[in-house]
Amino acid sequence: MGGDSHTPHGGAIGMLCIGVGGMDIATAMTGVPMRLKMPRVIKVNLTGELRPGVNSKEVIFEMLRRVTIKGGLGNVYEYVGPGAKTLEVSQRVTITNMGAEMGATTSIFPADEQVRKFMRSQGREDEFVEMLPDEGCEYDGEMEINLSELEPLIACPHQPDNVIPISEVEKKPVQQVFIGSCTNASYSDIAKAALVMQGHHVAENVSCTCAVSTKQIYRKLMEDGYAEMLLDAGVRFLEVACGPCCAIGQSPATKGVAVRTSNRNFKGRAGNPTAEIYLVSPESAAATAIVGTFATAEEIMGEDVKKLAEIKELEMFKIDDSMIIKPLPPEEAKEVEIRRGPNIAPLPVPDAPEDHLEAKISLKTVDNISTDDITPASAEFSSMRSNIPLMSKYCYHRYDLEFSERAKSLGKSIIVGGENYGQGSSREHAAINPMYLGVKAVIAKSIARIHKGNLVNHGIIPMLFEDPADYDKIDQMDELEIENLREQIKTREVVIKDKDKNVTFKAKLDLSDSELEVILCGGQLRYLKHQLEEMRKEAKQ
């Protein structure tokens, strides 16, 4: 479990890694188990082998093109087959990392010889345990991708599934290129980008930056001369962090065009809602930086593109864990003082839902609203994360400037959403801020998995239109009424009346028994307090 939507990153080495909200992590650490609906398991059979200049990012782009940004909801994708065996761990990471963009619960590769090789490179081969699919095991669905048939792809604005071949994209001037991120910053990724750029220079009107994923990779890139190649080409290095993806480090100009190797290109995510963000592989990003418009490695290197296939991950990295802060022994940990600065305010705790709810619709959104839309993550907002009263003023800041004041003035309200509401980051502030502003429920056509969990944890009732057509019958600022709410929650079906339109419609609650208990308590904190009290009583008996 990880409090980050890209926790499935670890699926590349055979781990079942699931992204959840921070409250879920904290709850599990108290000893209360995490529960989730049993996902479907989809087999993805990979055949063939990637051609030089074609990155494993093309695999996940192809998946997104087929599955879409919401089609993976409730699924685990298991990558197997002869093609999977050809992919090194760093290549697999790109695929499992971006599986989150499909809405998937997680993605996973077998723990095979490629994983053994990776563990050996980290001095941990003795900890390797082979874990392969059982012979003849059954899946809930199957897909197939021939790696040999893939070509360089590009995700166009403003969704990661808006994928087409680079050869088909409209050529336009590019002002920024970013190489790196948690998706594509391995040794081989950066080395290949450097080889593409060797002997060339970044185009005159392009700013190109690079962020390497780890110190050990950075060190090796310097030793092997690849870092120098990038510097000679006019590339600037940034600090290793999530920053460049969310406008900390390099934000595009107004109506600018930026090409990035990261995993999301939501409108405004890079800091400027007027800009266009395109996603590509490191090889294509390097080529684009040189030409000044969308390009591939083969266009730059010609026959020499074959040299890219010679770059592999290292047999051994220099291991230096000196900067890792390790946990204290339990007895010492008890004495640790928690220091809270003046900008850290207590977390608001919602009340249990009332039995009769009358509230106006404070906001009606379009499809595919992301948690970035709800709570931005760039530099000017990140410093507010521990101060909910302050940060809530910027809730939906990039979507509706008046939302915060409107919701606050209403006292209590309801948000109506379209398909895939709350996609993207696991950012629980996207639930905390609306809760603080009095939002009692979200009624949508569909809700992204992690965000739905965060809504439950913070006492906001997630509801789904029983008939999606009812979305069109109601409007922002209509007053909705729900009678006998608590009893209806228990049945998982709620009848809602729009008092302004004089129409009635139904919504359903796709929640487990434990999630229902949490909602009826008013959120995870109240539920957890109750659970711990019960556990103490049992212990005394």
Predicted regions and their residues:
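Fe-S-dependent hydro-lyases/dehydratases of central metabolism
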Residues: M1-Q541
